[in-house]
Amino acid sequence: KLFRFGGEHNHFIEGEDKEVKVIEVDGIKIALLICFELRFKNLWAQIEGADIVAVPSWWGGLRTEHFKSLTQTLAIMNQCYVIASDSLNDDCSKMSGIVNPKGEVTRNGDRELLEIP
């Protein structure tokens, strides 16, 4: 995690390596952006070429539209799948979902289970 948000400095140490790596598993290139890292386009450039970008988060409910827009834009800009997870905590956006490279979205909203048909 490169950026600490809110009170996270009480529990986490900022990462030392400012470069985001893309790993390959069975021919699939996978990258990880943790929560607030989603907001930095210089990090998007570092993961260009990834097939899948995972975004685990604890995204505040007041910024729900930001989370939705950023994950969708990341998928379109990098032509990749974005798998975004967020907490079901009442203070969070509850917008876990999968965005395809065309920007088409399947999200769980306030449901407890995300099902892909």
PLM feature spans:
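CN hydrolase (nitrilase-like) catalytic-core segments centered on the catalytic cysteine
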Residues: R39-L113
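Exposed aromatic-hydrophobic patches
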Residues: E115-P117
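Active-site catalytic loop in hydrolytic enzyme cores
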Residues: K1-E48, R63-E65, S69
